[in-house]
From Swiss-Prot:
Single Gene Ontology BP annotation: amino acid biosynthetic process
General function of this protein: Catalyzes the conversion of 3-deoxy-D-arabino-heptulosonate 7-phosphate (DAHP) to dehydroquinate (DHQ).
Keyword Cytoplasm belongs to the record: yes
Required cofactor(s): Co(2+); Zn(2+); NAD(+)
Catalytic reaction list: 7-phospho-2-dehydro-3-deoxy-D-arabino-heptonate = 3-dehydroquinate + phosphate
EC number: 4.2.3.4
Pathway where this protein functions: Metabolic intermediate biosynthesis; chorismate biosynthesis; chorismate from D-erythrose 4-phosphate and phosphoenolpyruvate: step 2/7
Protein name: 3-dehydroquinate synthase
Top-level taxonomic group: Bacteria
This protein's encoding gene: aroB
Pfam families: DHQ_synthase (PF01761), DHQS_C (PF24621)
Species name: Deinococcus geothermalis (strain DSM 11300 / CIP 105573 / AG-3a)
Keywords: Amino-acid biosynthesis, Aromatic amino acid biosynthesis, Cobalt, Cytoplasm, Lyase, Metal-binding, NAD, Nucleotide-binding, Zinc
Length: 368
């Protein structure tokens, strides 16, 4: 794990940068570039936008749709046009302010505009802080799947202002906790009880230290393997089914909730292939997360999306599995095992959270 100077994490590699974690960072952010394009989602609290605009005096501010609605080629093209309309120069910077979807989009804009300009990110959700803002993966979705178009474009710096987390309802905060918990399963098991602790909450005494350690896991991985030639693939634990659930439900299942469900499926597969039984850990997280019930699904519904996932190839569907805690590995899992364990997973999901009828699936606003 890379050294942490209190709440500063250094990310190494060809273009090293730092991740700062603390409160009140939005108002204190500074970049060396004289011109800045600020990109933020429509549902971001206006106080956050006001603070960053006062700190950076952007040449252009672009508001985009919220969550994954911004990660489309039409939105991407529209943002590029907005930058071109103000003649933003090559020595300018793009700043992404918001959740992980917006920072993914903003990074891809920065990587593409004038063949690449400086990029900075100010994640305002736990998911954005733990996962999307660190590592340099940027991009947008296609109807055929998530993140199929993009680029590796590391930021110059990341600022995680923990005060922004106080605005998040539990379901949104818990989405980011899923990625942090994943880091505990694949690399740092000390994170597991800390994430489930009452102290891990917005403003809680365990928040910043636990957040820093979760980010440090990913920082260490991407320092050693930026472009996912080896170890970085382990960060996809739980994501093969997660991406399939998102696609099969037309993205009505939020990413972090899909990851929670996907980690339990991966734990079942790990056990089926001879690994330790870690399903107690993944079920404990689901109980803490309290994800919304899934709509009725079958293996045949999600299989086409798993088969076209980036983690699939001509020899089968590749999954990240666990021999034990902090012992991840890659395996191609036969379809018959995937089907059998999906049926087992679905039964446990039903026992955990009964599937509602199609006309009573709760919205994000009605989930406790």
């Amino acid at each position: 794990m890379l050294p942490i100077n209190r709440h500063r994490i250094e990310v190494g590699g060809p273009q090293p940068y730092a991740v700062e974690i603390g409160s009140g960072l939005l108002a204190r952010v500074r970049v060396p570039e004289r011109q800045v394009a600020l990109i933020h989602p429509a549902d971001l609290p206006s106080a956050f936008v006001t603070a960053v605009r006062a700190a950076l005096s952007p040449a252009v501010t672009v508001q985009v749709p919220s969550r994954d609605d911004c990660k489309t080629l039409p939105v991407f093209a529209d943002v590029l046009s907005r930058l071109a309309q103000v003649n933003l120069p090559r020595d300018a910077a793009v700043v992404g302010l918001g959740g992980g979807a917006v920072t993914d989009l903003a990074g891809f804009v920065a990587a593409s505009y004038l063949r690449g300009v400086a990029f900075y990110t100010l994640p305002t959700t736990l998911l954005g802080m733990v996962d999307a803002a660190v590592g340099g993966k940027t991009g947008v979705n296609l109807p055929e799947g998530k993140n199929l178009v993009g680029a590796f474009w590391p930021p110059r710096a990341v600022w995680c202002d923990t005060e922004t987390l106080a605005t998040l309802p539990h379901p949104v905060f818990a989405e980011g906790a899923a990625e942090a918990y994943k880091h505990g399963l694949i690399a740092d098991p000390t994170l597991l009880p800390r994430i489930l602790s009452p102290d891990f909450r917005p403003g809680g005494p365990g928040l910043e230290d636990t957040l820093a350690d979760a980010i440090a896991v990913k920082a260490g991985v991407v320092t050693r393997d930026l472009t996912e030639q080896g170890e970085r693939a382990f960060l996809n634990f739980g994501h093969t089914l997660a991406h399939a659930l998102e696609a099969a439900t037309d993205h009505t299942v939020p990413h972090g909730e899909a990851v929670g469900y996907g980690m339990h499926y991966a734990a079942l597969l790990s056990r089926a292939l001879g690994g330790a039984d870690l399903t107690g850990h993944t079920l404990a997280f689901l109980r803490w997360q309290r994800p919304r019930p899934l709509p009725p699904l079958s293996f045949d519904t999600v299989w086409p999306y798993m088969a076209r996932d980036k983690k699939a190839d001509s020899d089968g569907v590749r999954f990240v599995l666990l021999h034990d805690l902090a012992r991840p590995y890659l395996a191609r899992v036969p379809a018959k095992v995937l089907r059998r364990e999906f049926d087992r997973w679905w039964k446990e999901v039903l026992d955990f959270a009964p599937v509602p009828s199609a006309d009573t699936v709760p919205s994000a606003d009605t989930v406790p």
